[in-house]
Every structure is written in C-alpha cells, then in structure tokens.
Amino acid sequence: MWTVQNRESLGLLSFPVMITMVCCAHSTNEPSNMSYVKETVDRLLKGYDIRLRPDFGGPPVDVGMRIDVASIDMVSEVNMDYTLTMYFQQSWKDKRLSYSGIPLNLTLDNRVADQLWVPDTYFLNDKKSFVHGVTVKNRMIRLHPDGTVLYGLRITTTAACMMDLRRYPLDEQNCTLEIESYGYTTDDIEFYWNGGEGAVTGVNKIELPQFSIVDYKMVSKKVEFTTGAYPRLSLSFRLKRNIGYFILQTYMPSTLITILSWVSFWINYDASAARVALGITTVLTMTTISTHLRETLPKIPYVKAIDIYLMGCFVFVFLALLEYAFVNYIFFGKGPQKKGASKQDQSANEKNKLEMNKVQVDAHGNILLSTLEIRNETSGSEVLTSVSDPKATMYSYDSASIQYRKPLSSREAYGRALDRHGVPSKGRIRRRASQLKVKIPDLTDVNSIDKWSRMFFPITFSLFNVVYWLYYVH
C-alpha cells in the first residue's frame, strides 16, 4: 500500500522535471538560442591566436592520447614495416575556449580545427601516413564548457618495424608506434595515455593472416636531443608468426621432394635415364623453392631458420644424385677396367704355362729338349739345362700328360709339412675376413651401395628434422 503511494508521489515529482528538460531542449533549438551559440563560437574564435600554446609562459600543456585500432592491414618483411589504421584522439585544456551559458558540448565542423591550436604530434617511425578524406576529411573537433578540446583523426600510417629474421618463420616480432612532439619540449607540452590501460582499444579484435597479436604495451618516456627533452609515447605490438602457411607452402613440399629423391635407390642401377632425370628434377625443384622464398624476403646478411632447412634438404637431394654418379662409376667405369685387366693377366699366365709345358719331338719320336726345362732344386739353388737340335722336325705335345718322377728333397718335404699344418690358420683368416665383410659394406658392389643408401638417407634426414625442430620450436 505504501509502495504504491510512493510510486505515485515519485511520478508526480518527476513529471515537472521532464517538462523542464523538454522545454530546455526546445529552447536550445529556438532561433534566439541558435544565435547565442553562434555568437559564443564567434567570440571564442575572435582574437584567438593559434601561434601560441595554451597557458603560454606557464606550466606545460598536458595532452592525453587515446587510440582505437581499426586494423593492421599488412606486415612486410621485405620493407620492414607494417600498416596500421586507427582512430587517433588527443585531448587538452585550453582556457581560451571555455564558455558558459550553454550546457552542451560543441562539436564543430572539421574546418574549425585549422583555426585552433593543436599539438604538433607526429609519428617518429612513420614512413607514409594520410588522413582519410571520404566523404569529407575524417577529423573531429569538440569543445567542452571548461575549455577541454577533443581532437580526433582517422589515420592510416605505414610505420617502420625493424625485424630480426634469424628464426624466420618461427619468430616473434615487436612492432612499435612512436608518438612524439616535433617542436615543443617538455617545458611546453607533456604527453600521457588518457585512460591508463584502457587508452588503447580494438587490439583484441584484430585478426591477421600470418600473425597473432600476443600482447601489446604502452610506454611513456622522455628522450633527449641536442635541442632539448621531448615527450614520447610508445605503443608496442608483440606479433607471433603463424607457422601453418609455411608448413604447407615450404616445409612439406621440401620434405616430400627430398623423400622423392630417394626413389632412385630402388631403381635398377643400369637405368641411367630414369635415375639421372629423377635426380636433376628434384635438385631443380629445390632450387626453385629457395629462389621463390628469397624473393619474398629482404637481402639480409645472416642465415634464417628456413634457409637452414632448405639448405639441408638441398644437400640430401644433391647427395642422392651424387650417389648414382658413384654407382655409375663403379659399374660402368672402374669395375670393367679392373675386370678387363684381370682377364688379360689371366690369359697371359695361361699362355706362358702352355708354352712352358710344350715339348718337341722329331720324326722318330725322340724328345728334343730345346724348350723343355728341367728344374732341379739342390741346396737351395736351381740348375737349368737345355739341349736343342735345329735340324730336327718339331711336333708340339702338351707335357701335362708326361709325368716325371723324382725323389723329394728334404726341403720339399718340410714345405709340404708346413702347408699341412698351415691349413687351420688360413681357415681362421677366411672366417675373420667374412666377419669383416658383414660389418663393412663392399663399396665395389653397386647393389650394396644402393642397399645402404636406403637406410642411411632416411635415418640421417630424420635426425636432421628432430634437431631442427627441437632447436627452433620453443
């Protein structure tokens, strides 16, 4: 019951207040009040000297900064810069622009800003900037009764961002926006972030194709020059590069091409056309990938992380091609030469043996000792005797069927005994040699070279990848 009566009394009291507000708003739009506003603005601008800062000769002017980041359009590694679009607002107090009698803020035409004093703010690391002008110049000037001035601009700036690309593309970059007074020192003007941590907004809404904004910081400081100390505000963005694009465009193709080069180890070694074509194709493809990557990056003096990976892949591909060159040399070059030389030596030895084993006989069947050599070993020396008869008719017989018996000397008997006792030692040597052949591949066997390459290349490439990713990925 009492609650209903209280509500009715509040309604009766608030009704006159609402009527008063409506009347005041209506009176503001009346021609007499519009003329008063016009007279107030004319009075403020009349005699206003834009050449002098507020409170000239007194304390420095405090200028507050606010930034609403609209977008980060591009981050370029080639030019070492980034493009930022923002709503940049500055506020300060100018007692010459204070007014009374109008309980409203005056938002004026953007051309009025040319008739008022504004801070000489500039971006220190700016390369190219402009104020948007569609459909009109995007700037705002707003006056408050106490003389506070709010000056806003919509700006797109391309600012320098010096990047360290040693860990590219697994890197993080810090790009800053430096705001400074060009002419006024700290004796005349002071900069501060208006709103503290909330002075910069819109950063969390930004999405970049190749980067993620991990964090941002606001810094206020003073810098010393020969002409004095100047105020500076710094907005720093910490950008982390997204690796997904580079995995699909660079790392995965390079890895697959490297693996493709190993297919030649399973192709027959006498298929020269297939193996050479595969090796050259993979080498040229790796060269193309490296060239395309260099075109998208600046010419810097140090080695980047992606350069190390591409260089490693190129080395593996090139070694696969050299492996076939080695196999080809063993099979078609050095191997046949050795076989030909051994065959020639063997045929020469057989020919000498045949000539030594041939005897000559005359027509009566008498053996002529013109070419038969009788070797007698006595007291560690050889006695060679030969008799010849040039008049006899000669027939050649193989002396392999002729057997000569002679008693064994003590030296020969001792040598045969040593041979019989030496057989086990030779067997042990052969077994050790066979064990060594299992451990050490025969580099003269082309099949063995390909077989070992099938294991060596994948293992070493996998080890290279493990070391690379463990080092560069945190």
From Swiss-Prot:
One of its GO terms (molecular function) is ligand-gated monoatomic ion channel activity. Changing residue 246 to S: In DEE45; no effect on localization to the plasma membrane; increased GABA-gated chloride ion channel activity; increased single channel burst duration. It holds the Pfam family Neur_chan_LBD. Keywords: Cell membrane, Chloride, Chloride channel, Disease variant, Disulfide bond, Epilepsy, Glycoprotein, Ion channel, Ion transport, Ligand-gated ion channel, Membrane, Postsynaptic cell membrane, Receptor, Signal, Synapse, Transmembrane, Transmembrane helix, Transport. Changing residue 421 to Q: Found in 1.1% of population and in some schizophrenic patients. Disulfide bonds join 161-175. Residues 26-245 are extracellular. Residues 1-25 form the signal peptide. It is a multi-pass membrane protein. Glycans are attached at residues 105, 174. Residues 328-451 are cytoplasmic. Potentiated by etomidate, propofol, pregnanolone and flurazepam. Potentiated by histamine. This is Gamma-aminobutyric acid receptor subunit beta-1. InterPro entries: GABAA/Glycine_rcpt, GABAAb_rcpt, Neur_chan_lig-bd, Neur_chan_lig-bd_sf, Neur_channel, Neuro-gated_channel_TM_sf, Neuro_actylchol_rec, Neurotrans-gated_channel_TM. SUPFAM superfamilies: Neurotransmitter-gated ion-channel transmembrane pore, Nicotinic receptor ligand binding domain-like. GABAARs subunits share a common topological structure: a peptide sequence made up of a long extracellular N-terminal, four transmembrane domains, intracellular or cytoplasmic domain located between the third and the fourth transmembrane domains. It is found in: Postsynaptic cell membrane; Cell membrane. Beta subunit of the heteropentameric ligand-gated chloride channel gated by gamma-aminobutyric acid (GABA), a major inhibitory neurotransmitter in the brain. GABA-gated chloride channels, also named GABA(A) receptors (GABAAR), consist of five subunits arranged around a central pore and contain one or two GABA active binding sites located at the alpha and beta subunit interfaces, depending on subunit composition. When activated by GABA, GABAARs selectively allow the flow of chloride anions across the cell membrane down their electrochemical gradient. It comes from the Eukaryota. It catalyses: chloride(in) = chloride(out). 4-aminobutanoate binds at residues 182, 227. GO terms for cellular component: chloride channel complex; dendrite; GABA-A receptor complex; GABA-ergic synapse; nuclear envelope; plasma membrane; postsynaptic specialization membrane; presynaptic active zone membrane. GO terms for biological process: cellular response to histamine; central nervous system neuron development; chloride transmembrane transport; gamma-aminobutyric acid signaling pathway; monoatomic ion transport; ovulation cycle; response to progesterone; response to toxic substance. Belongs to the ligand-gated ion channel (TC 1.A.9) family. Gamma-aminobutyric acid receptor (TC 1.A.9.5) subfamily. GABRB1 sub-subfamily. Heteropentamer, formed by a combination of alpha (GABRA1-6), beta (GABRB1-3), gamma (GABRG1-3), delta (GABRD), epsilon (GABRE), rho (GABRR1-3), pi (GABRP) and theta (GABRQ) chains, each subunit exhibiting distinct physiological and pharmacological properties. Binds UBQLN1.
